[in-house]
UniProtKB/Swiss-Prot annotation:
PANTHER family tied to this protein: HEMOGLOBIN FAMILY MEMBER, HEMOGLOBIN SUBUNIT ALPHA
Modified residues annotated as Phosphoserine in this record: S3, S35, S49, S102, S124, S131, S138
Source taxon at top rank: Eukaryota
Name of the featured protein: Hemoglobin subunit alpha
Sequence similarity: Belongs to the globin family.
Function: Involved in oxygen transport from the lung to the various peripheral tissues.
PROSITE patterns cross-referenced by the UniProt entry: GLOBIN
GO cellular component: blood microparticle; haptoglobin-hemoglobin complex; hemoglobin complex
Species in which this protein is naturally found: Saguinus oedipus (Cotton-top tamarin)
Length: 141
């Protein structure tokens, strides 16, 4: 459960991402594909090379979903309901992949905002991404 301090940290950190959200999403996806090659199996139709338009496009979708989750941090199940349905019923993404992408997002944010990535912010973002993952996998049951 996100505390008021966690919510504040997440909103502040995501606010600093600003117009770079799509780029960070794409970078996190690239990190995931390189670090965890089995994740590529969900994207057989994508050009997964560095800077690919498809990876950038999906990175923007990831970032937009996270921006939506930040904006609706008190009601993520409703805000992410359609996305949860998509991943559970159509795409059938293995839930472990959300943890892998979350880790890569944390690394990406830390690399771009080292001064702002304090232990408290890191912990809050980790809890937030875990909450997003929980919501996205809630309809798998």
């Amino acid at each position: 459960v996100l505390s008021p301090a966690d919510k504040s940290n997440v909103k502040a950190a995501w606010g600093k991402v600003g117009g770079h959200a799509g780029d960070y999403g794409a970078e996190a996806l690239e990190r995931m594909f390189l670090s965890f090659p089995t994740t590529k199996t969900y994207f057989p139709h994508f050009d997964l090379s560095h800077g690919s338009a498809q990876v950038k496009g999906h990175g923007k979708k990831v970032a937009d979903a996270l921006t939506n989750a930040v904006a609706h941090v008190d009601d993520m199940p409703n805000a992410l309901s359609a996305l949860s349905d998509l991943h559970a019923h159509k795409l059938r993404v293995d839930p472990v992949n959300f943890k892998l992408l979350s880790h890569c997002l944390l690394v990406t944010l830390a690399a771009h905002h080292p001064a702002d990535f304090t232990p408290a912010v890191h912990a809050s973002l980790d809890k937030f991404l875990a909450s997003v993952s929980t919501v996205l996998t809630s309809k798998y049951r």
